[in-house]
């Protein structure tokens, strides 16, 4: 069933005890179906569960559940070359009834799947962002590094405003000083300069598995990788900037508007060479076109 029944006092409904993951299964060039780095997603869910005091699903249970869902929905895995994939959404919620502010004693772990089309409907094109200085996604020592529902609820107002104003989403800054870049919408951020892949380091940023993979690919391509604070003022020094995450893999950015300072940072109208190479390499690994030398894919046979 696509519906669940729970007590109206379940902690997920009152106190936000909810964590989730986002991952994909691909049909490769060889016809085989593979999931991309599911063990990393499992570890991140365990981290999220610890962050809001929920029972932790074991790694193997998590991965086996995802495999089972893919097998049961095998006919919905899009064909190779379509640019589409089967999206998986593992969810962990507190279902135990609890009126006081305490962790639940019962939890539900579930996984659903749905086919999704290619993210870039009209080709791999850059997008525009604006800086959100009047909204914070997460506090420095809060839940920003966990994939929990509250972080996304906190981004809805600013995200919808950005879309209404013609932007893809907004750039969130560090909540303490509003001078450093945290995230790009629901994705991580990276910039390229002097053959270096630079991505923010902060306790309020969700550790992206896509970003982790791109860092490794950048090193494989002979680039230097820096994980460090990135000030807003440094944007003008980057040759390329982009957002990265499960949905798009890489979303090149060609414009970032800073309303407070009435300043617009601009890049090329077409995706940069490095961003394109990173995107094509990671996509190639996911669908079996490029050798998976780090053994990231888990086959579903």
Predicted regions and their residues:
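Helix-start/capping segments and mature chain N-termini
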Residues: 1-65, 69, 91, 98-301
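Extended, Lys/Arg-enriched charged tracts that mediate electrostatic binding to polyanionic substrates
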Residues: 78-93
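Short boundary motifs at domain starts and secondary-structure transition points
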Residues: 77-78, 101
């Amino acid at each position: 069933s696509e519906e669940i029944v729970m007590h109206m006092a379940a902690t997920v409904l009152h106190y936000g005890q909810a964590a989730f993951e986002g991952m994909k299964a691909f049909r490769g060039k060889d016809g085989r179906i593979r999931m991309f780095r599911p063990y990393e997603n499992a570890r991140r869910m365990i981290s999220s569960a610890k962050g809001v005091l929920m029972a932790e699903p074991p790694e193997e249970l998590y991965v086996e559940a995802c495999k089972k869902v893919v097998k049961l929905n095998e006919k919905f895995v899009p064909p190779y070359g379509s640019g589409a994939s089967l999206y998986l959404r593992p969810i962990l919620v507190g279902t135990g009834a609890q009126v006081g502010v305490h962790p639940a004693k019962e939890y539900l772990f579930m996984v659903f799947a749905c086919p999704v089309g290619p993210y870039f409907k009209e080709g791999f094109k850059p997008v525009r962002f604006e800086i959100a200085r009047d909204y914070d996604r997460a506090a420095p020592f809060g839940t920003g590094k966990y994939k929990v529902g509250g972080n996304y609820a906190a981004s809805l107002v600013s995200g919808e405003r950005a879309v209404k104003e013609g932007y893809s989403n907004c750039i969130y800054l560090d909540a303490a000083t509003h001078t450093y870049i945290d995230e790009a919408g629901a994705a991580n951020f990276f910039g390229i300069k002097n053959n270096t892949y630079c991505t923010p380091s902060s306790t309020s940023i969700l550790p992206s598995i896509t970003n982790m993979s791109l860092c490794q690919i950048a090193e494989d391509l002979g680039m230097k990788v820096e994980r460090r604070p990135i000030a807003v003022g440094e944007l003008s020094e980057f040759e390329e900037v982009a957002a990265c995450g499960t949905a798009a893999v890489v979303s090149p950015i060609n414009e970032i508007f800073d309303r407070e300072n009435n300043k617009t940072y601009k890049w090329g109208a077409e995706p940069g060479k490095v961003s394109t190479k990173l995107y094509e390499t990671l996509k190639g690994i996911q669908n079996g076109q490029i050798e998976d030398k780090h053994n990231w894919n888990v086959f579903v046979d």
